[in-house]
């Protein structure tokens, strides 16, 4: 017998979905149209969500996923890439994906992708 999970939103973001169910935090890259390729906004939002996961004692495990069934994540979005770097909405060169990778590795909870 399969039961329907009632996920609740932890926080609203522009490019990710961040929700919770029974000790599980789920972070979904929500850019299906671009095969969930990340932008500076995506990595900033993921970093914030991972910080919340680290700090909340009711979160026991983190699941990272991508929207749709085509791709988990295609990497960096080439549409926002400038000359040699990724450009955010403010025109500043940044992507910070290594910071997010460090957070994933150092969070004291299991992370499943």
Spell out what each predicted region is.
Residues 1-65:
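Conserved CoA-thioester-binding segment of acyl-CoA-metabolizing enzymes
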Residues 10, 66-103:
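Glycine- (often His-adjacent) and acidic-residue-rich active-site loop
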Residues 13, 56, 75, 107-108:
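Acidic-histidine catalytic/liganding microenvironments
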Residues 38-39, 76, 85, 108:
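Short, flexible helix/strand-to-coil boundary loops that buttress conserved ligand/catalytic motifs
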Residues 100-113:
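Conserved catalytic cysteine-centered active-site region
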């Amino acid at each position: 017998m399969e039961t329907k999970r009632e996920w609740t939103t932890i926080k609203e973001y522009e490019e990710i979905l961040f929700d919770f169910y029974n000790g599980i935090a789920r972070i979904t890259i929500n850019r299906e149209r671009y095969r969930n390729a990340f932008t500076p906004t995506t990595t900033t939002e993921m970093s914030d969500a991972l910080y919340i996961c680290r700090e909340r004692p009711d979160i026991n495990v983190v699941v990272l996923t991508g929207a749709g069934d085509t791709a988990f994540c295609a990497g960096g979005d080439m549409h926002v890439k400038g000359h040699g770097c990724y450009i955010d909405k403010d025109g500043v060169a940044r992507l910070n994906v290594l910071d997010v990778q460090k957070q994933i590795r150092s969070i004291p909870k299991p992370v499943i992708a």
